[in-house]
Amino acid sequence: MIVGLHHVAIGVDNFDKALTFYTEALGFEVVQQSEFDNDANANQAIGLDGIKAKMAMLKTPNAFVELWQYSQPAPQDLRSRPCDYGYPHIALQVDDIQAEYDRLKTHGMEFVGEVVHLSDDASAIYGRDPSGNIIELYEIKSKEIAQLDR
């Protein structure tokens, strides 16, 4: 039985810069940090040979985000657009979208434009982390699709 979403993994091109952004700008907490250098168990679990990577597990209010920077195999820059297949973005629910938008801009987050009010109870805006991964800020007041229990 599936009991919930545990984490979302995000590939980054500069581990230290990403870790600083996700902890200082977004307020996530580091709960685990590891380095892998051709570890047999990691190779088998991930399905790649000879991996060399850094990983950090970050705690959010109701799930985890995992940051990965691989140096082997050599990563490719496959930044997605919101319309591409795969995992094109993560959404962070916020309680004051304009305040978070303004605050994250001071941390260097680049947004596609200004906050959009989608309806009376929903607002959203897309931006990118320092590695170019898409992050949506989402303010929703409707209890049916608001944040799950913490």
Range-by-range predicted roles:
Residues 5-13, 33, 54-66, 70, 78-150, ...:
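Vicinal oxygen chelate
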Residues 49, 72-73, 96-97, 117-118:
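Short beta->alpha connector loops
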Residues 11-62, 106:
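Core segments of cupin and vicinal oxygen chelate
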Residues 69-75, 139-140:
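Acetyl-CoA-dependent GNAT
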Residues 39-44, 74-78, 145-147:
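A short, acidic/glycine-rich surface segment
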